[in-house]
A protein has these predicted regions:
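Tandem CBS (Cystathionine beta-synthase) repeat/Bateman regulatory domains
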Residues: 1-124
Length: 124
């Protein structure tokens, strides 16, 4: 396969990017993900962060009250990111290496999100 035939992150990423404040409740984050039928939201902080459905489920499984928790209590910080011009095979390798399912796409600023579902659908 020539490089011109290869699929890049920009070809597949979800955009516009959905975000949520670090001060929102975890319950609000869960409701937003359900409404949008997505599994992760970017939290516009420095360092970069996301909150995923797994973060929410972990909090519930630990017996924590998600109505009282804020996104900053459960979010994943210092997340790996990818650039829009990265090839999907490289994204698959990153996800496998780091054991992650969502990668924010960054081109100076957030521009989208790529998920393991996107990778599987593209490479299968």
């Amino acid at each position: 396969m020539s490089s011109s035939d290869r699929v890049t992150v920009a070809d597949v990423m979800s955009s516009p990017l959905e975000t949520i404040s670090k001060d929102a409740t975890v319950e609000e984050a869960a409701e937003r993900m359900r409404e949008l039928d997505i599994n992760a939201l970017v939290v516009p902080t420095n360092p970069r962060a996301i909150v995923s459905s797994t973060d929410v489920l972990d909090a519930v499984a630990e017996g924590r009250n998600v109505a009282d928790l804020t996104v900053s209590d459960v979010m994943t910080e210092d997340v790996e990111t990818v650039s829009p011009d990265l090839y999907m095979e490289e994204v698959a390798a990153m996800m496998e290496t780091y054991g992650i399912k969502h990668l924010p796409v960054v081109d100076d600023d957030y521009v989208g999100m790529i998920s393991s579902t996107d990778v599987t659908a593209t490479l299968s």
